Curated annotation (Swiss-Prot):
One of its GO terms (cellular component) is extracellular region. PROSITE patterns: EGF_CA. The keyword Signal applies. The gene is crtac1. FG-GAP repeats lie at residues 48-90, 107-149, 285-335, 397-439. The keyword Secreted applies. It comes from Xenopus tropicalis (Western clawed frog). One of its GO terms (molecular function) is calcium ion binding. It is found in: Secreted, Extracellular space, Extracellular matrix. Residues 1-30 form the signal peptide. This is Cartilage acidic protein 1. Disulfide bonds join C565-C579, C572-C588, C594-C607. Keywords: Disulfide bond, EGF-like domain, Extracellular matrix, Repeat, Secreted, Signal. Pfam families: EGF_CA, FG-GAP_3, UnbV_ASPIC. PANTHER family: CARTILAGE ACIDIC PROTEIN 1.
Amino acid sequence: MMLPADFFVPVSKMMLLALLLSIIICCGGAQRSEPMFTAVTDTVLPQDYDSNPTQLNYGVAITDVDNDGDFEVVVAGYNGPNLVLKYIKEKGHLVNIAVDERSSPYYALRDRQGNAIGVAACDIDGDGREEIYFLNTNNAFSGIATYSDKLFTFRNGRWEDLFSDEVNLRRGVANRFSGRSVACIDRKGSGRYSFYIANYANGNVGPHALIELDETASNLSRGIIVLSNVAAELGLNKYTGGRGIAVGPIVNSAASDIFCDNENGPNFLFQNKGDGTFVDIASSTGVDDVYQHGRGVALADFNRDGKVDIVYGNWNGPHRLFLQMNTNGKVRFRDIATQKFSMPSPIRTVIAADFDNDQELEVFFNNIAYRGPSANRMFRVGRREHADPFMEELNPGDASEPDGRGTGGAVTDFDGDGMLDLILSHGESMAQPLSVFKGKQGLKNNWLRVIPRTKFGAFARGAKVVLYTKKSGAHLRIIDGGSGYLCEMEPVAHFGLGKDEASSLEVTWPDGKIFTRSVAEGEINSVLDIAYPHEDDTVTKPTDIECGQGFSVNENGRCTDTDECIQFPFVCPREKPVCINTYGGYKCRPNRRCSRGFEPNEDGTACVAQVAYFGSYPSSASRSQALFLHCTASLLGLGFYFQIYTL
C-alpha cells in the first residue's frame, strides 16, 4: 500500500533536522565556533624596526636572559639580528633588549652575520644561569655551512661566544654543519646540560652532535669553559636529515631520553641506559616512521595514564599521536591520530599545552603557507575513561594565520595572568613580523605553574612534574628541553585546573631524585618555585600529603596508584567479575576467554586482535571506517527520506 504524500509533510522538518543533526554529530565536520586566540600584536609587540622588524625569523626559545626572574623571548633571526624580547609590565609591551649598541651586555646575542634557525637555552657549566645556543645555517641546506653556530654565556658582565674562545677554537668543537633543531639534555643527571644538535647531513658529511662541558679541562672559577663534542663516543653521531628533537623521561622514569623525527630516514628514540649512554629503540617501539618527514614534536601524557606520549607533525604527511603502552613489560607506541588530526599539511612547529586551563591538553599545528594558504590548526585532546582520548578540532581564531609563513613558535605567560600566551615567528619564503596571541577561553579557570630548579639553581629542563588533584587524578608535564621544531618552550610545568583543586605535586629530576609536597588552597593560581632537594627535603611525612581520587600515600610519602582490585568488598559487579587496575582507577569486564592473539574488548562482549601481538598499531583507519559507515548510514537515511517524500 502506498502512503499518501501528505503523510510525511507534518514531520518532514523534524525528520530533516534530526537527520542533519545526526550527520553533523557523527561526522564531526565543524570546528568549535568560539575562537581560542585573539591577536594582541598591535598592542604588545607592534611592528617596529628595533623590536619587531619585518624579517625572516625562525626558532623561538623562552629563558631568563637578564637574570631578573622573568622570562624573555629569544628569536632566531635569519636575515636580520636575533631578538631578545622583554615584557615591560608598566607599558604592557615586549621590547627588544638586544639593541644595536656595542656597549649593551646583550649586543653579541644579535649576531647579525649568522643565519640563525634553531635556538635553545640551558645551564651547561653549572653556574645557575642558562647559556644560549644559536644554530646557524649560512649558505647551506645540508652539509657544511660557511658560518659556525654560536654558544653564548654570560661572562665579564656581558654575553660572549664560547666557541670563539681560543681553547675551543683549537679543539674545533664549534658545529659548522647545516642543522635544524637544538635541544638540551642532562644526560648524567649532574645538573649540567649538553646541547644536542640535529644536523642535516649530506651523505657522510654533517652528523648529529652533542656538545658539553669538559669538566677536567675547564677552570670555572677563572671563566675557562672547555667544550667537547661527545656524540661519537655515545653513538649519537648519526647521518640523517635531522629535524625535530624532544628530550625527557620518555621511556625511563627519570633519566632523559631523546626523540628525533627525521627526514628521508627513520626516526630515533635514544633510550638513556641510566649512565648517560644511549641505545636506539625507535624501531622496536614502533616510532621509526621510516617513510615520513618529521618536523615539530612535543611530549605529553594525553590519556593521563602516567606514561609520556609523543605527538609530531610530518611535512605534508600524516601527523602522529603516539600513545605509549606497556605490554608484557615491553614498551610500544600506538598511533591514535584521527583522520582530521593526521591530515597532512606543510607543518613546522607543534605545541602541546593547556591554553584554556580546562585540564585537557590542546595541540597547536603551526603551518607555513606553502604554495598557497595553509591555516594553522588546533585540537583538544581529552581523556576518556577506559578509551583512547578524543580529538576535537578547535577554532584557533586570529592564530589561524592562513597566509602566515610559519617557521617557529613558543608559549609562555609573559604577563603573569595564568593564561599561556602564544608567540609565532615567520619567514623562509617571505619576510613577516612576529605575532602574539592571547587566549580567549577559560579565563575564569584555575591554574598552577611549577618551576623546578637544578642543584645549581637553573631551570631543571627534562624534569617530570606530576600534579595530583582532588577530582581529576594525576596530570603529568615534562619541563621542556627543546621541542616544537627549532624552538624551546618555557621551563614551566603549566597546569590548567578548571574548577578542580590541586592536592599535591611530585617532581622527579633526571638523576632520579624525587620531591613531594602538598599544595595549599591559597597556592592555587600562583607560581611555585621548587628547589632541588637536599637529603632531608626528600623525606615527606605521609600525613602531609593528600593524593586525591584513585591514589594513596605510600610509606615513603609519595602518591601511588591505588589497586582497587584487591580491596574488600570487591569493587566489580557479578556480571563483570574481572577487575583490571588502571592508573588512577579500575575497570570491570565479563570473564570472556579468547584465542591466542586476541583479547576481550572494552565491554568483554567480543574478542578483538591484540595490537601488540600483531606488532602493528592501528592508525585512524579503523575509527575512520566506523565513522564513515555511521555517516554513510545517516546519508542513506536522508536519501531514503527524500526518495519517499518525492513519491
